[in-house]
Amino acid sequence: MVLLLGIVIAAMLVGTNSSPSSPVEIKPLVAAPSDRSQWDSWRQRLTAARKQMQHRLDYRDDLYRRKEFAWAASCYCCCFAMMCDQRFYDPAGRRYTAAQYLEEGESQFGGYDAVVLWHAYPRIGFDDRNQFDFYRDMPGGLAGLRELSRALHERGVRVFIDYNPWDTGTRREPKPDVEMLAEIVSAIDADGIFLDTLHEGTSNLRDRLDAVRPGVVLESELTLPVERIADHHMSWAQWFQDSPAPGVLWNKWFERRHMMHQIRRWDRDHTAELQMAWMNGSGMLVWENVFGSWVGWSPRGKAILRSMLGIQRRYAGLFSAEDWTPLVPAEQAGTYASLWQRGGVRLWTLVNRSEQRVEGTLLKVPHVKGQNYFDLVAGCECGRVCGNGVSLNGSIRPHGIAAFLGKWPLEPHGVSLTQFLARQAAMDQEADWSVSSPGPQERLRPVERTRQYKAHEVPDGMVAIAGVSLRMKTEYRNRECGFYDVPGQKPPAQPSGNIHKVVSFTREVELTPYAIDLTPVTNAQYVEFLRRTGYTPADSESFLKHWHNGQMPTGLEDHPVVYVDLEDARAYARWAGKRLPTEEEWQYAAQGGDGRAYPWGNAFEAGRCNDGRAGGTTAVAAYAQGRSPFGCYDMCGNTWEWTESERGDGRTRFCVLKGGSYYKAKGSDWYADGGPQRCDFSAKFLLMWPGLDRCATIGFRCAADLAHDGGE
C-alpha cells in the first residue's frame, strides 16, 4: 500500500533538477527546485498532490478536530530525557528533579512542551527484566512516575512513555504489549507514546488508548506512512536531508496540524534541523544525553531555538492553518522565506543559508492598508511602505533565522505584543553565536585503598598477585551508550558506522601488588556480613530480591550473591577489610600475563563455566576446570561482576562489568551483552538508583592492597 501511494504521488511532483512537468519519486522531505522561476509550478503540484491523496485515502481529520488532541499541534519542543540523567534524577537526594530540569531547559533552549521518559535501553538485557519492568522499577514505582507526571503537567509539559517493540527476548508479560502500554499510560497519566524503531503503531493501539485516557498521541521514530497520519498526531523527521532551497515536509504539508520533530542525534551543529523546522512550521527534538553519550548543542543552536520557540508558540494557529506558501521570493542571496496567513495576519519565516550576515531589505511584499510590520526576532517595528508595497528590512546572522509579522494594531490575548517584542529583543541581543559545544568532563572515581597487607596477612580465600606493568587490550561492543574516555584515543562521534560490532583498544597499565578473591562473594558470606553489621541500604528496593522474606534460600549458600548494587558490594568489602577490584586488576587476575582470551585458554570450551544451561546461578566453585592462571573461579559466565570503575560527568554515571553471566537476552542487537564473555571484554553499565541497579545477574568479588616489598 505504501509503495502504491508513493507511485501515485510521484506522478504529481517535480524535483530540484526537473522540468516543471516531470515526475519524481516523493520523499519524506520534498525537495524544492533551485530555480525560483519553477517555484509557482512546484507549489501548484504540491497542492494538487495533497488534494488527490486526501481524496484517494478518503482522509478524515476527526482525531485532529477533537479537543483533547489539540495540544499536539503546538508541541514544538520535545525533550528526550534519559531517566538516569543526574539532572533528571538526583541519586544523592534520591528524588526526581523535574523543576530543576525544566528550568535548565527554559534557560538554555526556550523550554520544553513535552518530555519523553526514556527508561530501559541501553540497560535492558543485562537481566530478564522487560521494558515494562523498567518503568515499575523506577524510583517510587508507577506511583512515583505518576507524581512525576503531575509535576511536569503543573508546568504545562506533556509526558511521553517509550515503547520498544524489539523487546521480545526478556521476561514475558501475561498480556499483549498493547494492553501493557495502556496500563502504563493509565497508571502514570502519560500523554503520548514514542514508538521506538517503528514507522507506525498497531491498528488497535489507538482504540485501546482512547479507552483509558483521552488525548494520548502516538509519535513514530521512523517515517510515518501517509495513510497513518489520521491516527498519529506526531512523527520524527530523522536524518532528513534538505535541498539547497528549503523543501517541504510531506506529512506536515498533507496535514497542517501534524507535528514533526526534527532530529539528527549525533550532530553537534543543528542548524539544518532548525532551519527545516522553521521553514515548515514544525518542531525540534532536544537530545543531548544520547543513551549515555554526551552530544551537546552549541550556543548558536540554543539561541536559534529559543528565538524560534517564542514565535512558534505565540503564533501556533498560523503554523497549523491551511494558508501556507512555501518559498516566497526573498531579496538577499542565500535567504529563503515561507509565508503563513490566517485571519488577515501574515507571518514570514526566513532562513539564511550562507556563512555571512545578510542585511538590508530582506522581503518586498504587498502592503495591506492599516497593517503594521514587526521584526519578531530582533523584537522591533519595521517596514517601509512605498505605494502598494512594503520593504521589510533587517539582518540575519550566518545560518540564522528571521521572522516578520504583518498585522492590524489589535493586541491578542495574553502577553502584549510590546512585551513579547521586548523579550525577543533581549534574547537576540544576548545571543551567543559560537559553535563550540564542549561537554562535561568525565571523571573516574578514586579507588579507596585498603591497608597494605603483608604476604603472611593475605586473607583466606584470596590469592596474592605481584605488581606488573603491561600492555592491556580491552574489547567492548560499540553501542550507542559509548564507552569511557581513553587517553590518546578519539571517541567515535557516532557508532552508526560499526554499531553493535566489537571494537578494541590497548593501553599501558601498571598494577601494584594486590590480592583478589578466588571466588565471587557467596550468599552465605553476605548473610554473615548482614548478621555482623546489621547493614540496611537506604533504598531497599530489589535488595537481595532472590531471598525469601529476607532469608537466604536453602541450596544457594555457595552461589554468588546477586541483587546487590555497587554500594551494597562496597559495604561488604569495607567490612571485610577489602575493596572491589579495578577493571584492570580483575582482567589481569582472569587472564594472567599471557593475555589469553578465556581464563583457561584462547578458545571457548563448553563445560568450563556456567553458560546458562543451568537456568540460573551455580555454586562459585562448580567449574574447577575454568579457573584462571591465578586459580580464580567463575571469571567467565555465572554472573557479571562489579568493578571499582565508576565514572561520571555530572549527567551520566556508569561502571564497567566483567565476566559475562548465565543470562543472555535473545532476539535483538539492541539488548545489552550477556552470556559468558572473554577476559578482555568490558560492558558499560549505566547507573541510576539501587532499585534498577540491583540485578539477578550481577555479583562481585573483593580485592585488597598488598605491601610493595612483599615482605613478612
Over which residues does each language-model region extend?
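A short glycine-rich, aromatic-capped structural motif
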Residues: 454-544, 564-567, 637
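An acidic-aromatic substrate-binding cleft motif
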Residues: 37-43, 49-53, 57-93, 119-122, ...
